[in-house]
Every structure is written in C-alpha cells, then in structure tokens.
C-alpha cells in the first residue's frame, strides 16, 4: 500500500470517528430543574434517562422551585429544562421571555387532567350526592366540622407562603364563607394539609378544601373536584383573588383559574438538543391517571423520583414509547 492510500485510509477513518463523536455529542450537556414536588421530580428523572440513554445527552439535574428556576432560566439561561412549570404566577413574564427568544414553551399540556381547586372525598358524595357544587357545600357547614371549633365548618387552605394561600383567603371572602358558618383551617405545612386529608379518609369523615392534581393523594383517595361555577374573569383573578387581602377590596366568587402548566426550555436546549430533543418534549404527555398512579406508587413504596422513573419505563412502555423514536426506544429498553 503506497503512502497516498495510507493517508487516504487514515483520513476516512478519522472522518468516521469524528462524525461518530459529533453524533454522540450532538445533544451536548443539558441541565434539568429537579423541582421540589413529587410529580416534577419524577418527570425530571424520566427526562434524564430518556435524553441520556435515548439521545446521547449529558444530563445534570439541579435543584429547583417554580419562581427561582424561572428567574434563573430567564436571566442566566439555566437550567435548560423545567419539565413541570406552573406558569400562572409568571405568565406575563414567560410570554415576554418567549417573545424575546430566551425561552420556549415546548409543551403546553405535559400532564392531562391537572389543575387546582376545591375537593371533597368520594365517601362524602356517596352519602350526600347533592354536594357536587361549591354553593351546595357551603350551605352545609355542619357536615364539615372545624377541628378546633366544631360549631363552624372547616375550610382547609394552603400553608403560609404558598401563592394559593392568598387566593383561598380571598375566595373565603368572595363566597362570604364566614357569614355562612365557615372558618379557615390553618394547615401550617404541606404535611399538615396532606395529613388532614388522610386522617379524614381513613376515619370516613368529610373533608373540604384546596388541593391540586396531579398528586398522590388525589389518586390514592379518589378525591373529586368541586364545581365552583363560572370563571369570573382575568381582571378579578389577576388583580384581586391572587393578591394580598389589602390589594383585593372586592373579590368576586369564581372558579379556579385554569392551570397553565408547561414544559419550558431555554434557547440553548433548542439549539443543542436539535429536532430529536424538541420532538421528544413536545410528544411527552402523561395521562393524568398514569401520573397519579405513579405518585401513589412513590408514596406506597417511599420511593424517590429516580426509582419511580425506572418503574414507569419498565411498566408503561405503551405510554412512553409513543414519545420517542424507535431507535431511541430500543436504546432505552437496553439500558434498563
């Protein structure tokens, strides 16, 4: 073999090696917000496995919470992905960031059937099938005795510091609940709120208050959303119900605002991950019952999101294989 052939062969080999390296590293290094609640933690872990094993990304999970994560993505361009971003509190700012090309709302419905509002336990409706609306429930405070003042109905709200605490306190005034014989139950913490539901369910007692889906408790106890009637408009919600009490002089009763929950990504992810990564996140929609079922599994097994992600990928192939290419699915199955 002459020197020209040797050089040509070397160049061809080098070319294939370089191309292969580029292909494997095409996705690059990606950071995903590992939010501080179960469903978002689970979703982040699933995204990590799929993007790493299926598409060759180098994924790092970073601790996150709704507003700090959004601020960091907007100002610093990191983390690259917020799998479950509840956008109601920052919808204007998000729309601005999207219009400027800083962020992308890749998936505007990553989980079906989610939302916030008022809920009751199924046993309550079995005994009192007429209590399907907020108006009907508020006429019967006697059925939902306050734990510290049984002469009043107990209305369970969010812990201090949560955005929904403000909304529920304003709803309390809007629906004139005090006049109707109700009193707010101060739950104190997320554990306190969850514990009040579990205690009522296990004792066969009635419970009424705020909660949201997807969550393990909604799935475990089959909780039923209360019909709160019509939505009273954006101005009432944005400029009154969601504000501190001193900024909401005349709240109007309303259904809960539609929950805007997106998968949001930075422009860096769009450029680094390419069409395959973007296509995966666009297709990645969890059916509500499946998500609630996984959250129940996590609770029953005291499992973290990483454990749940493996369980999901092993047992729910009919769901997740629709999100990825055939070649990616094959790689992911092999990795499991």
Where on the chain are the PLM-derived regions?
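Short, polar/charged alpha-helical segment
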Residues: 39-57, 173
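Short, well-ordered beta-strand elements
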Residues: 26-39, 57-62, 152-156, 281
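A conserved helix-loop-strand patch within extracytoplasmic ligand-binding domains
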Residues: 103-157
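An extracytoplasmic/periplasmic, membrane-proximal ligand-sensing/linker region
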Residues: 39, 165-180, 190-204, 216-218, ...
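A bilobed periplasmic-binding-protein/Venus flytrap-type ligand-binding module shared by bacterial periplasmic
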Residues: 115-126, 258-273, 294-297
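C-terminal lobe and pocket-closing loops
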Residues: 220-285
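Ligand-binding pocket segment of bilobal, Venus flytrap-like solute-binding proteins
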Residues: 71-73, 79-86, 156-237
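Immediate post-signal peptide segment of exported/extracytoplasmic ligand-binding proteins
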Residues: 22-32, 144-152, 321-323
């Amino acid at each position: 073999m002459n020197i020209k052939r040797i050089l040509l062969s070397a160049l061809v080999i080098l070319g294939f090696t370089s191309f292969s390296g580029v292909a494997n590293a095409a996705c690059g290094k990606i950071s995903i917000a590992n939010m501080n609640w179960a469903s978002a933690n689970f979703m982040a872990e699933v995204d990590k496995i799929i993007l790493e094993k299926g598409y060759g990304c180098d994924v790092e999970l970073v601790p996150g919470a709704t507003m700090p994560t959004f601020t960091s993505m907007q100002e610093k361009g990191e983390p690259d992905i917020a799998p479950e971003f509840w956008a109601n509190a920052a919808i204007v700012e998000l729309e601005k960031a999207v219009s400027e090309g800083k962020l992308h709302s890749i998936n505007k419905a990553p989980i079906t059937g989610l939302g916030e509002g008022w809920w009751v336990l199924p046993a309550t409706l079995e005994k009192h099938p007429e209590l399907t609306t907020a108006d009907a429930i508020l006429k019967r405070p006697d059925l939902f005795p306050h734990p510290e003042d049984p002469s009043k109905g107990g209305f369970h709200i969010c812990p201090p510091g949560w955005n929904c605490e403000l909304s529920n306190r304003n709803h309390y005034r809007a629906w004139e609940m005090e006049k109707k014989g109700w009193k707010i139950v101060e739950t104190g913490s997320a554990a306190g709120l969850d514990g009040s539901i579990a205690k009522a369910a296990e004792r066969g007692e009635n419970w009424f208050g705020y909660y949201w889906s997807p969550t393990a408790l909604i799935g475990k106890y089959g909780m039923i959303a209360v019909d709160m009637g019509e939505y009273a408009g954006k101005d009432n919600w944005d400029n009154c119900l969601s504000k501190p009490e001193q900024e909401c002089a005349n709240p109007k009763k309303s259904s809960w605002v539609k929950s805007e929950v997106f998968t949001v990504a930075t422009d860096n992810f769009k450029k680094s991950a390419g069409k395959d990564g973007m296509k995966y996140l666009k297709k990645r929609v969890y059916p509500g019952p499946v998500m609630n079922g996984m959250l129940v599994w996590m609770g029953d097994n005291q499992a973290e999101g990483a454990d749940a992600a493996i369980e999901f990928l092993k047992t729910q192939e009919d769901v997740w294989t629709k999100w990825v290419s055939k070649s990616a699915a094959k790689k992911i199955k092999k990795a499991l």
